[in-house]
């Protein structure tokens, strides 16, 4: 079981990396809103097919009203607002630096979980947050040293803000997802989020 989880985690990391590269190129060609719309539409189609094959139910008709509420809010925040911030950051500072900022999302999620869900923050989690934050600061400062011109630095600053906002948005979305999905099917739960994003 641990091996399956490790393979899944590795596969997720690979997919995240590839998708970031594709999204960066897409935003430069058709814009942020275009990429975001096509992303959620394709996601809905694939999720519907997956749910139909695995559960025999292409639409999440068995979800409770509470599940619909939490996951719909999560979808709008995560797949609309957050991804608009993220894709704008891709377009401004590139996928490499933007993805680096996403590394602080688990830290924001842990803090929000502590505040709203009363989850416990272990000391090693606090140390990890500090290390990640330090790494991001070093990367940003290194990039600033090789940049020349006020306009370029202002564009970078704007990109950093959008990347940070996307990280925070992802964390807020995750808190709503935790509350909504609980024991519900993960694929169908994600489909609710995607459906709300298409409407939103």
What are these regions (language model features)?
Residues 26, 35, 39, 89, ...:
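Hydrophobic/aromatic residues within transmembrane alpha-helices
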Residues 41-47, 101-115, 130, 195-200:
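Alpha-helical transmembrane segments of compact multi-pass small-molecule transporters, enriched
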Residues 30, 93, 119-121, 184-185:
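Membrane-helix interface residues
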Residues 11, 38-39, 101-104, 123-127, ...:
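Hydrophobic core positions of alpha-helical segments in small-molecule transporters
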Residues 1-34, 45, 150-195, 199:
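Glycine-/small-residue-enriched transmembrane alpha-helix faces in small-molecule transporters
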Residues 59-65, 102, 109, 113-138, ...:
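Loop-to-transmembrane alpha-helix entry segments
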Residues 18-33, 80-96, 138-151, 200:
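C-terminal ends of transmembrane helices
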Residues 4-12, 51, 58-81, 85, ...:
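Loop-to-transmembrane-helix transition segments
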């Amino acid at each position: 079981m641990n091996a399956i989880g490790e393979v899944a985690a590795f596969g997720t990391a690979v997919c995240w990396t590839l998708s970031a590269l594709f999204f960066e190129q897409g935003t430069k060609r058709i814009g942020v809103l275009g990429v975001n719309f096509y992303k959620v539409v394709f996601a809905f189609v694939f999720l519907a097919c997956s749910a139909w094959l695995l559960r025999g139910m292409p639409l999440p008709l068995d979800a409770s009203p509470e599940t619909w509420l939490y996951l719909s809010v999560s979808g709008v925040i995560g797949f609309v607002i957050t991804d608009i911030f993220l894709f704008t950051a891709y377009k401004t500072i590139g996928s490499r630096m933007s993805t680096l900022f996403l590394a602080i999302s688990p830290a924001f999620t842990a803090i929000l979980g502590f505040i709203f869900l009363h989850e416990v923050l272990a000391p090693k989690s606090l140390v990890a947050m500090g290390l990640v934050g330090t790494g991001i600061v070093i990367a940003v400062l290194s990039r600033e040293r090789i940049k020349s011109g006020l306009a370029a630095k202002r564009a970078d600053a704007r990109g950093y803000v959008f990347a940070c906002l996307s990280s925070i948005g992802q964390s807020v979305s995750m808190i709503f997802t935790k509350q909504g999905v609980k024991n519900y099917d993960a694929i169908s739960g994600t489909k609710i989020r995607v459906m709300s994003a298409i409407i939103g």
